[in-house]
Curated annotation (Swiss-Prot):
Pathway: One-carbon metabolism; tetrahydrofolate interconversion; Amino-acid biosynthesis; glycine biosynthesis; glycine from L-serine: step 1/1. Homodimer. Its EC number is 2.1.2.1. Catalyzes the reversible interconversion of serine and glycine with tetrahydrofolate (THF) serving as the one-carbon carrier. This reaction serves as the major source of one-carbon groups required for the biosynthesis of purines, thymidylate, methionine, and other important biomolecules. Also exhibits THF-independent aldolase activity toward beta-hydroxyamino acids, producing glycine and aldehydes, via a retro-aldol mechanism. It comes from Neisseria meningitidis serogroup B (strain ATCC BAA-335 / MC58). It comes from the Bacteria. The gene is glyA. One of its GO terms (biological process) is glycine biosynthetic process from serine. This is Serine hydroxymethyltransferase. It catalyses: (6R)-5,10-methylene-5,6,7,8-tetrahydrofolate + glycine + H2O = (6S)-5,6,7,8-tetrahydrofolate + L-serine.
Length: 416
């Protein structure tokens, strides 16, 4: 029998210590990785619940195990809420990740060797959109589009490649593209060649939910998203559709094809996050995320840095470090010493290797969750520039770190 009186610290002090250290790191560092965010205590409560004990293969009302009457309620709440949030007719909340959601979409209507047209990883796309190192690039014949000479998504190239290669599916969405994507234009191109249109909105989903980024659902055959990032939920995935045409194929692609039992504790946490995103205050959050990102980009330009695509229209942007003569890898390390967390990221036509890069990616979602406003964002951008202008000066790093600490103390991750 387990006892509720035995704490993790008592039973496994080594693990408890590592968790405590990570808690402290999150408090003491400003998080600027675009794919990260903080979840609410309610989300964590749901994810840490006894639902983790329950196996529930199948779907609500059609399970392969007994005792699922209450987890059916949990999953249906998540389904209903995410459908309302994005105006979808169909939702599958069982994918363990965005990558698995994407795999399920491909498997539902494609056969190995079919052609897909997706955004190049080198220009801001995602591994799962046909990169050669990913299963999507191994199973399918992947053709890629990219950015034009102004570092704007090249819709003319998308259309030219679509007409040339006649893909069965066109994939839109990105992991490192700052501007708004024209879903209607993609729909127009897809219709010209009779292709399915699939949008991966993982990075933008929270902005879509908050009304600050165009909703792809009305234009697409398939939409996927992660539930973390700008959506502020647990780590996981979702599949959405504007109608129920592919319901049977998608459901069977997830279970039994790609996954077994769903993670009911994570689905419960998703349901909480969807409820939070349906509240009026989430719209203000999404608006502030964009304001903060734009403010940071503006300040960095003033300090002599170049922003890929020239600006941001979302939560994310890439910084070209070549004018500073520093690599992304070195910048990530220097900023980390100053308690500013970013990730190195390739820029379009990057001459450096992927593990080195010539850029960094900056996102405003997590800092905005903490409460950072536009003025704070501008201060933070200048602190980033201070580090990048003198990345090996320990005194400079210590000075910036002290100012970062003051900002972090002003905005604790979890208040009283």
């Amino acid at each position: 029998m387990f006892s509720k009186s035995v704490t993790l610290a008592q039973y496994d002090p080594d693990l408890a210590a590592a968790i405590a250290q990570e808690d402290q790191r999150q408090q003491d560092h400003v998080e600027l990785i675009a794919s990260e965010n903080y979840v609410s205590c309610a989300v964590m409560d749901a994810q840490g619940s006894q639902l983790t004990n329950k196996y529930a293969e199948g779907y609500p009302g059609k399970r392969y195990y007994g005792g699922c009457e209450y987890v059916d309620i949990v999953e249906q709440l998540a389904i209903d809420r995410v459908k309302e949030l994005f105006g979808a007719a169909y939702a599958n909340v069982q994918p363990h990740s965005g990558s698995q959601a994407n795999q399920a979409v491909y498997a539902s209507v494609l056969k190995p060797g079919d052609t897909i047209l997706g955004m190049s990883l080198a220009h801001g796309g995602h591994l799962t959109h046909g990169a050669s190192v990913n299963i999507s690039g191994k199973l399918y014949n992947a053709v890629t589009y990219g950015l034009d000479e102004n570092e704007v998504l090249d819709y003319a190239e998308v259309e030219r490649l679509a007409l040339e290669h006649k893909p069965k599916m066109i994939v839109a969405g990105a992991s490192a593209y700052a501007l708004q994507i024209d879903w209607a234009k993609f729909r127009e191109i897809a219709d010209k060649v009779g292709a399915y249109l699939f949008v991966d909105m993982a990075h933008y989903a929270g902005l879509v939910a908050g009304g600050e980024y165009p909703n792809p659902v009305p234009f697409c055959d398939f939409v996927t998203t992660t539930t973390h990032k700008t959506l502020r939920g647990p780590r996981g995935g979702v599949i959405l559709c504007r109608d129920n045409t592919h319901e049977k194929a998608l459901n069977s692609s997830i279970f039994p094809s790609l996954q077994g039992g769903p993670l009911m504790h994570v689905i419960a946490a998703k349901a909480v996050a969807f409820k939070e995103a349906l509240q009026p205050e989430f719209k203000q959050y999404a608006k502030q995320v964009k304001i903060n990102a734009a403010a940071m980009a503006e300040e960095l330009v003033k300090r002599g840095l170049r922003i890929v695509s020239g600006r941001t229209e979302s939560h994310v942007f890439l910084v070209d470090l070549q004018p500073m003569k520093i690599t992304g890898k070195a910048a990530e390390a220097a900023l980390g010493k100053a308690h500013i967390t970013v990730n190195k990221n390739a820029i379009p036509n990057d001459p450096e290797k992927p593990f080195v890069t010539s850029g960094i990616r900056i996102g405003s979602a997590a800092m905005t969750t903490r409460g950072f406003n536009e003025a704070d964002a501008r201060v933070l951008a200048n602190l980033v520039a201070d580090v990048l202008s003198n990345p090996e000066d320990e005194a400079n790093l210590a000075k910036v770190r002290k100012q970062v600490t003051a900002l972090c103390n002003k905005y604790p991750v979890y208040g009283a």
